[in-house]
């Protein structure tokens, strides 16, 4: 679990967000280390708990709240031969040019080469004449 700060209006348990990097005001903020220092650009986070601590912030309409976040499970298309529940693999994105499936082919929050654990097989999906498995994965750190 990671402690960070989010805008007061976004501080709701269950909310997911992608961290894209620091804003200009963050570079001189005294809270930057706790706010953005624990987050990795391009990763998806899910708020699991909102604490009753707030701080002023010029970026987030006046206030930020202290929250606890985790990286959630993410759905991604995978070659069927690698889709084994419980296995850990190095993520390799499939080739699929269907715009409707873009978020499943290269979901935000995951990068090519990430070590992931396959949690669940969700569905069979066809794309470009090929059959893939839609799986739910969790990124392994370290």
Curated annotation (Swiss-Prot):
Pfam family, any one: UPF0179
Family: Belongs to the UPF0179 family.
Protein name per the record: UPF0179 protein PH1477
Organism: Pyrococcus horikoshii (strain ATCC 700860 / DSM 12428 / JCM 9974 / NBRC 100139 / OT-3)
Record lineage: Archaea, Methanobacteriati, Methanobacteriota, Thermococci, Thermococcales
């Amino acid at each position: 679990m990671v402690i960070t700060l989010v805008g007061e209006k976004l501080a709701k348990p269950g909310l997911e967000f992608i961290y894209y990097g620091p804003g200009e005001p963050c570079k001189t903020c005294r809270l930057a280390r706790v706010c953005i220092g624990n987050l990795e650009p391009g990763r998806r986070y899910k708020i699991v708990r909102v604490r009753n601590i707030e701080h002023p912030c010029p970026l987030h309409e006046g206030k930020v709240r202290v929250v606890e976040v985790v990286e959630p499970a993410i759905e991604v298309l995978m070659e069927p031969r690698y889709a084994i529940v419980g296995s850990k693999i190095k993520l390799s994105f499939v080739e699929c040019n269907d715009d409707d499936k873009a978020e499943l082919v290269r979901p935000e929050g995951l990068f090519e080469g990430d070590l992931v654990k396959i949690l669940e097989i969700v569905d069979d999906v066809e794309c470009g004449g090929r059959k893939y498995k839609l799986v739910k994965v969790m990124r392994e750190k370290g």
